């Protein structure tokens, strides 16, 4: 279906707004994936705060100009599915990685975070906010417990020497 100039400008503006509000972006090629599976992917994406869209490469190049995802321009070859993570930087990467495991024809082309091209594995393994807080609390708790054990051991040694 041919798009007129106003439609193209609207698409560019919409994708540009999504890019400006996103934490990360992941690019994929979904050729060969059934409509049912893509519909399921879109549903899961919405639940995880990920906005997905298939966009023509020329429009996508214009849409990402001036954003931190401009570094992805070289990956805009062939059919391009772009996903922007708005709530967590690793959400789209994790979603696409899991989907690619179940669907051989789904190919992840690239990802960007903080203005740089990143490995999808790196983004997919980023901890969520809650996971990061839990890790930090665990580390702090371990440090406090270790300090207590060392203090008690030193006190025991001091008492043994005095006896």
Curated annotation (Swiss-Prot):
GO terms for biological process: translation. Keywords: Ribonucleoprotein, Ribosomal protein, RNA-binding, rRNA-binding. Pfam families: Ribosomal_L10. One of its GO terms (cellular component) is large ribosomal subunit. It comes from the Bacteria. GO terms for molecular function: large ribosomal subunit rRNA binding; structural constituent of ribosome. The keyword RNA-binding applies. Signal peptide: none annotated. CDD domains: Ribosomal_L10. PROSITE patterns: RIBOSOMAL_L10. The keyword Ribosomal protein applies. Part of the ribosomal stalk of the 50S ribosomal subunit. The N-terminus interacts with L11 and the large rRNA to form the base of the stalk. The C-terminus forms an elongated spine to which L12 dimers bind in a sequential fashion forming a multimeric L10(L12)X complex. Forms part of the ribosomal stalk, playing a central role in the interaction of the ribosome with GTP-bound translation factors. Belongs to the universal ribosomal protein uL10 family. This is Large ribosomal subunit protein uL10. The gene is rplJ.
């Amino acid at each position: 279906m041919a798009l007129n100039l106003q439609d193209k400008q609207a698409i560019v503006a919409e994708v540009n707004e999504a890019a400006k509000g996103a934490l990360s972006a992941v690019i994929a090629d979904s050729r060969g994936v059934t409509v049912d599976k893509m519909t399921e992917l879109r549903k899961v994406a919405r639940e995880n705060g990920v906005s997905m869209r298939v966009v023509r490469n020329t429009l996508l190049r214009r849409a990402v100009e001036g954003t931190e995802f401009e570094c992805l321009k070289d990956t805009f070859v062939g059919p391009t599915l772009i996903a922007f993570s708005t709530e967590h930087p690793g959400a789209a990467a994790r979603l696409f990685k899991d989907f690619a495991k179940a669907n051989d024809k789904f190919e992840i082309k690239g990802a960007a975070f903080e203005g740089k091209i990143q490995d999808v594995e790196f983004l997919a393994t980023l901890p969520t906010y809650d996971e990061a807080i839990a890790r930090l609390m665990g580390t702090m708790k371990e440090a406090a417990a270790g300090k207590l054990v060392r203090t008690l051991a030193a006190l025991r040694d001091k008492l043994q020497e005095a006896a």
